[in-house]
Amino acid sequence: MKLVVCFPGIGYHCDKPLLYYSRKLAACAGYDHTLLLQYTYHKDGLRGSPAALREAFDTLYAQAEAQLSAADCPQYDDVLFLSKSIGTAVSAAFAQRHGIPCRQILYTPLSLTFAFAPQNVLAFLGTADPWSDAFSVAAAARANGTPLFLYENANHSLETGDVLHDLATLQDVMQKTQTFIADTPH
């Protein structure tokens, strides 16, 4: 049995392109069980405030913990975490704290994500992401041994405003995602 878990961001739910298409690719690769997490968080002022971001992380982590309590990850032969934004920190923390041997795909990770030393990871980030300092995240990814693909002038949704360019970026991200998913785990 194979499980895929989607960890959304606060404003980026599981039916938005990065998580939607990566989840479909996982299903095509034989992931027969899917869990889509949902969060509730309504406070403003997260950007530029490490304390507020940490508070949001703690709240979302507790919600994820509650939703994953019945998942019984060890029963699965292969576990894949797909995550976006603050969800990348939640997924990395959950894997670390529970010792789950999973693979993770991090879409637009935050610097906080790498505090949990995610393993078996692939990451994607835009250089114009207002939520992540691309230089800091790239340095943290490098120190963690995480392959990170950077997209020039792309924002937190990996978009630039040029629709055709954005579609090409999405296709590139999904091709890399598909290759990572298809690789033999662990």
Predicted segments, located by residue:
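Short, proline-enriched alpha-helix->beta-strand connector loops that line the catalytic pocket
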Residues: 2, 102, 116-121, 144-146
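Serine-hydrolase catalytic machinery in alpha/beta-hydrolase-like enzymes
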Residues: 2-75
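Conserved alpha/beta-hydrolase "acid-adjacent" motif
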Residues: 15, 115, 130-136
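Gly/Ala-rich beta-loop-alpha elbow adjacent to hydrolase catalytic centers
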Residues: 82-92
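A conserved short beta-strand
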Residues: 99-111, 120
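Short beta-strand/loop motif that positions the catalytic acidic residue
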Residues: 123-125, 129
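Catalytic histidine-centered segment of alpha/beta-hydrolase-like enzymes
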Residues: 154-169
